[in-house]
């Protein structure tokens, strides 16, 4: 579903789903605003956002890219991960829209 503001990745059976893996963290603001708008208009009942858990950084610090650089440089603190999402949920940027936040951690990597 597309709004005048932002695309949601998937919409099915009144559930909006978005996967944010390594985008700039402002993407969460757009996702939450879109889900909030859809919820307020009665188009969805819940939003689901999947992102990285903080403990995945332990793996990224050890893994190297093709140039021998630590992957943590690519997956830094300004990109999407659970800590950036929870801050926004605690600030109620989702309005009244229920959000299921899922963090993919190192045990799932």
Residue ranges and their predicted role:
Residues 54-109:
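Domain-level recognition of nuclease-like catalytic cores that cleave nucleotide substrates
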Residues 11-18, 47:
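Glycine-rich, often proline-containing surface loops adjacent to acidic residues and nearby aromatics
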Residues 2, 29, 42-58, 67:
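Class I S-adenosyl-L-methionine-dependent methyltransferase catalytic core
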Residues 21, 32-47, 90-95, 101, ...:
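Catalytic core segments in nucleotide and nucleic-acid processing enzymes
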Residues 15, 22, 40, 52:
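Residue-level marker of positions within ordered structural domains that often coincide
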Residues 1-13, 26-33, 40:
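Active-site metal-binding core of divalent-cation-utilizing nuclease and nuclease-like domains
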Residues 24, 28, 40, 71, ...:
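Short capping loops/turns at secondary-structure boundaries
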Residues 18-27, 56:
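Short beta-strand-loop-alpha-helix junction that forms the active-site gateway
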